[in-house]
C-alpha cells in the first residue's frame, strides 16, 4: 500500500515549505502535475504495476487522471466523489474560500488568521462538505455556534496555510481530464480512453463535488460501475466520518478489488 501526499498539501512540496519558491512565489500546479510527481516516485521505486489506484474527492480526481495518464500501470481504479472536469459550482465554492483567506483579489495578502478562520471554517468545514441532515446532529443552535468557534480556534492554530489552500484550490479549479495531451480538451474522449476496470462512488447529494459529475464520469468510462453511497453526510460520505459509511465502502471496494 502506497499513500502519497499531494503537492501543495503542506507535507509534500508546497508554498508553506518550499525554500526556493515560498508563499505567493510558488508556481501554479495542476492535478495532472500531482499525478506526474507520483508516477516519478513509482519509477524511482521500480514499481511497474498498481493493483488499484484509490482516492476520494481530489484523490478521486487524481485516480481518474492516473487511469488516463498511465493506462499500462493502472490495473483498477476506485474514484470516490470525483469530477472529471471541475464544475462551476465547485469553482465558486473554492473562490469563496479564497476570499475568506485573502484580503485582496490577487490573493497576495492573507487576512489576519482569526478573521480568516471565522469566515473560512463555516464554509469549508461544515456547510459545503456536510449536509442539512448532518447538521441535525447538533442538539441546539448554541451547540452549533460553539462547534464553529472551537473549529475556528483549532484551524487558527494548526492550519491550513493560506498559500497551500490557494495552490490546491487553483489546481482543483483548473482540472479537466480533457486537457491531458492527446485529447484536445475533450473530457469524454479522455474518459473513454480508460481501459482499467473502474468503480465510481458518490452520494446523491454533494455540495462540493456534485453527484451528477461523478455519474457523468462513470457513464463515459467503458464498463465502469457507478454506486450511489447511501449516506446523509454529503461530500464527507467518503471521508470516514461515519462508521456505517466506512463499512459500506469497505465492502463495496473489497468486492470490486477481488474480481
Tell where the protein language model's regions lie, with residue ranges.
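Conserved alpha/beta-hydrolase "acid-adjacent" motif
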Residues: 207-213
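Alpha/beta-hydrolase-fold enzymes
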Residues: 73-155
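Conserved acidic catalytic loop of the alpha/beta-hydrolase fold
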Residues: 32-52
Amino acid at each position: 500500500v502506497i499513500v502519497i501526499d499531494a503537492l501543495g498539501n503542506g507535507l509534500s512540496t508546497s508554498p508553506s515549505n518550499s525554500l526556493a519558491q515560498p508563499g505567493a512565489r510558488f508556481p501554479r500546479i495542476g492535478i495532472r502535475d500531482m499525478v506526474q510527481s507520483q508516477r516519478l516516485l513509482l519509477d524511482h521505486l521500480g514499481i511497474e504495476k498498481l493493483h488499484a489506484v484509490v482516492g476520494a474527492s481530489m484523490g478521486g480526481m487524481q485516480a481518474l487522471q492516473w487511469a488516463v495518464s498511465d493506462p499500462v500501470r493502472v490495473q483498477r481504479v476506485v474514484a470516490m466523489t470525483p469530477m472529471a472536469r471541475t464544475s462551476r459550482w465547485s469553482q465558486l465554492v473554492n473562490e469563496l474560500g479564497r476570499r475568506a483567506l485573502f484580503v485582496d483579489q490577487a490573493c497576495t495578502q492573507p487576512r489576519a488568521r482569526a478573521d480568516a478562520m471565522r469566515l473560512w471554517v463555516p464554509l469549508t468545514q461544515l456547510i459545503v462538505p456536510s449536509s442539512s441532515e448532518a447538521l441535525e446532529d447538533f442538539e441546539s443552535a448554541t451547540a452549533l455556534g460553539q462547534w464553529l468557534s472551537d473549529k475556528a480556534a483549532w484551524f487558527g492554530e494548526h492550519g491550513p496555510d493560506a498559500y497551500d489552500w490557494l495552490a490546491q484550490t487553483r489546481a482543483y479549479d483548473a482540472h479537466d481530464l480533457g486537457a491531458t495531451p492527446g485529447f484536445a480538451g475533450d473530457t469524454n474522449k479522455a474518459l473513454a480512453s480508460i481501459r482499467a476496470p473502474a468503480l465510481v462512488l458518490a452520494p446523491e447529494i454533494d455540495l462540493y463535488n456534485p453527484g451528477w459529475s461523478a455519474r457523468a464520469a462513470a457513464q463515459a468510462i467503458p464498463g465502469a460501475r457507478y454506486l450511489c453511497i447511501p449516506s446523509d453526510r454529503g461530500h464527507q460520505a467518503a471521508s470516514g466520518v461515519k462508521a456505517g459509511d466506512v463499512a459500506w465502502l469497505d465492502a463495496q471496494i473489497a468486492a470490486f478489488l477481488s474480481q
